């Protein structure tokens, strides 16, 4: 019996050592993926031109300002966010500021029914909104539609440096 307990103890210690090595490496890999995806999302939109709001658009029955980069409409258009995810994995979203809310207008984030989560709003009481309202980025864990993600949220600023939307990338934990 003592030999059996010793073997179990050695195996348990080995598992702890391996997990203490692997878990930080997984977290670092996720952080690197988030940074890489955000850089890709920003680069793809910058190539299109300066961000601006123009007119009104309907997103899942909500009227919101139209989000453009240069002459390219982003509202209800998924090419850019889908390209970022195809290249890097994870999820990507563009939010537009509509009053006090930030509304998903281009995303590959899916709701429980499998539909894109366009028209849903950023949690107005969550940790992200406080940083965005200060014009700052948020990097860290966030609950998105009830699921934990490692995320990066960066303000989208117009030519006058006003925050008009948010870039988002994230990876499920």
What is the predicted role of each segment?
Residues 1-9:
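N-terminal secretory signal peptides that target proteins for export/translocation
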Residues 8-17:
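Hydrophobic helical h-region of N-terminal Sec-dependent signal peptides
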Residues 16-26:
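C-terminal segment of classical bacterial N-terminal signal peptides
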Residues 31-74, 109-116:
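Extracellular/periplasmic ligand-binding regions of membrane signal-transduction receptors
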Residues 36-55, 81-102, 139-141:
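Short N-terminal helix-loop-first-beta-strand/juxtamembrane motif that initiates sensory/input modules
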Residues 67-73, 148-173:
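Conserved beta-strands of PAS-like sensory domains
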Residues 75-89, 106-146:
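Extracytoplasmic/periplasmic sensor domains and loops in membrane signaling proteins
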Residues 101, 145-149:
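Short acidic/glycine-enriched loop/turn segments that link adjacent beta-strands
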């Amino acid at each position: 019996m003592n030999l059996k307990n010793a073997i179990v103890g050695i195996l348990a210690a080995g598992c702890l050592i391996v997990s203490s090595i692997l878990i930080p490496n997984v977290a670092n890999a996720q952080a690197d993926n988030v940074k890489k995806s955000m850089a890709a999302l920003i680069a793809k939109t910058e190539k299109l031109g300066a961000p601006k709001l123009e007119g009104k658009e309907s997103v899942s029955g909500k009227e919101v300002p139209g989000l453009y980069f240069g002459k390219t409409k982003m509202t209800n258009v998924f090419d850019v966010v889908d390209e970022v995810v195809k290249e890097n994995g994870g999820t990507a979203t563009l939010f537009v500021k509509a009053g006090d809310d930030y509304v998903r207008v281009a995303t590959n984030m899916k709701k429980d029914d499998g539909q894109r989560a366009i028209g849903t709003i950023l949690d107005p009481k969550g940790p992200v909104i406080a940083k965005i309202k200060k014009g700052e980025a948020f990097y860290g864990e966030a609950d998105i539609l009830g699921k934990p993600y490692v995320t990066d949220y960066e303000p989208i600023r117009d030519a006058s440096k006003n925050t008009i939307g948010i870039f988002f990338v994230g990876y499920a934990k």
